[in-house]
From Swiss-Prot:
GO terms for biological process: isopentenyl diphosphate biosynthetic process, methylerythritol 4-phosphate pathway; terpenoid biosynthetic process. Belongs to the IspG family. This is 4-hydroxy-3-methylbut-2-en-1-yl diphosphate synthase (flavodoxin). The lineage of its organism: Bacteria, Pseudomonadati, Pseudomonadota, Gammaproteobacteria, Pseudomonadales. It comes from the Bacteria. NCBIfam families: ispG_gcpE (TIGR00612), PRK00366.1 (NF001540). Converts 2C-methyl-D-erythritol 2,4-cyclodiphosphate (ME-2,4cPP) into 1-hydroxy-2-methyl-2-(E)-butenyl 4-diphosphate. Pfam families: GcpE. Pathway: Isoprenoid biosynthesis; isopentenyl diphosphate biosynthesis via DXP pathway; isopentenyl diphosphate from 1-deoxy-D-xylulose 5-phosphate: step 5/6. It catalyses: (2E)-4-hydroxy-3-methylbut-2-enyl diphosphate + oxidized [flavodoxin] + H2O + 2 H(+) = 2-C-methyl-D-erythritol 2,4-cyclic diphosphate + reduced [flavodoxin]. Keywords: 4Fe-4S, Iron, Iron-sulfur, Isoprene biosynthesis, Metal-binding, Oxidoreductase.
Length: 369
């Protein structure tokens, strides 16, 4: 039953992506990106709905050409979550999705082209109240910066970002956020640190092309964890070569670990050893699968023996300590004993009961103001 995060977040300007605030005092928003063919409207809508069910706040959709832009408009009509259009090279695509109701434009001004084209995109965004994300990536730095620095560096990423920020400043446009992504953790972290000191706009965090589910999760947790612990970051996207739903889960797990957001169950579980009185790994796998639908923030401890079990269980909303018999704690107090027979079924029932009670109590507290 952990309290508020001790992290003091960097002060930033608040913008709105659809109905989701980003920056300022807003919760750190969790994003993901579809990996379907955007022209396959049904498949893309279905994937977006799965992301919504997982708790995503904002979804980015790649729009590589005009056909995809028209498909984007149809997708937008069928979903409620804010959509970001990912635009490269052709500024006319950005103009079209702006007409079709996009909630945010992700552009790399370095590959959009001449200043008049960037101005056209900015004017369209301003007229419709659409924010822009300046997306700088180590893999697509401007040629002059590549020549100047010889290779991608934190300073090169920041110089590119500030170049585009100054461009928007000249156009008197402030409704934007910025990312400076790299696949190298240290490069990305240092770039964000440098940029955070120089602008007030919200920062979109990510380790780009981080890798597969396991390696990408580790890289993202390390890199984003370092930044978030320093108060840097207003929205996050975990880039994984995996099901996009996993990006949302990992994003929330990172935020939960830092007490920056709470959604669903925060499991505390031992790695298990020969002292365990029940199969901890099997129990955890079953519980995680069964309880994915719960959205109420809840700490659940699953500890296999009495060495650390009672201490961890007393700190959780629901805790299980292995023993003969096993002992359940509710809100830090011993509640009932359980044998290994139907252990997961009984534990699931108790967790759901506690979640319902907490949801009711939280609702009453909100109603009282």
């Amino acid at each position: 039953m952990h309290g508020e995060s001790p992290i003091k977040r960097r002060e930033s300007r608040k913008i709105w992506v659809g109905n989701v605030p980003v920056g300022g005092d807003a919760p750190i928003a969790v994003q993901s990106m579809t990996n379907t063919d955007t022209n396959d409207v049904a498949a893309t809508v279905a994937q977006i709905q799965r992301l919504v069910d997982a708790g995503v706040d904002i979804v980015r959709v790649s729009v590589p050409d005009m056909d995809a832009a028209e498909a984007f408009g149809k997708i937008k009509q069928r979903v409620s979550v804010p959509l970001v259009a990912d635009i490269h090279f052709d500024y006319k695509i950005a103009l079209r999705v702006a007409e079709l109701g996009v909630d945010c434009l992700r552009i790399n001004p370095g590959n959009i082209g001449r200043e008049d084209r960037v101005r056209a995109v900015v004017d369209a965004a301003r007229d419709r109240g659409i924010p822009i994300r300046i997306g700088v990536n180590a893999g697509s730095l401007e040629k002059d910066l590549q020549k100047k620095y010889g290779e991608p560096t934190p300073a090169a990423l920041v110089e590119s970002a500030l170049r585009h920020v100054e461009h928007l400043d000249r156009l008197d446009f402030q409704d934007f956020k910025v990312s400076v992504k790299a696949s190298d953790v240290f490069m990305a972290v240092e770039a964000y640190r440098l940029l955070a000191k120089q602008i007030v706009q919200p920062l979109h965090l990510g380790i780009t092309e981080a890798g597969g589910l396991r390696s990408g999760t580790v890289k993202s947790a390390v890199g984003l964890g370092m930044l978030l612990a320093e108060g840097i970051g207003d929205t996050i996207r975990i880039s994984l070569a995996a099901d996009p739903v996993e990006e949302v889960k990992v994003g929330y797990d990172i935020l939960k670990s830092l007490h920056l957001r709470s959604r669903g169950i925060n499991f505390i579980a031992c790695p298990s050893c020969s002292r365990q009185n029940f199969d901890v790994v099997k129990t955890m796998n079953e519980l995680e699968g069964r309880l994915e639908d719960l959205l109420v923030p809840l700490d659940v401890a699953v500890i296999g023996c009495v060495v650390n079990g009672p201490g961890e269980a007393k700190e959780a909303h629901v805790g299980l300590t292995g023993g003969t018999p096993n002992l359940i704690y509710i809100d830090g107090k011993p509640a009932q004993k359980l044998t290994n027979d139907n252990l997961v079924d009984e534990l699931e029932k108790l967790i759901r009961q506690k979640a319902a009670e907490k949801a009711e109590a939280d609702a009453a507290l909100i109603a009282r103001g």
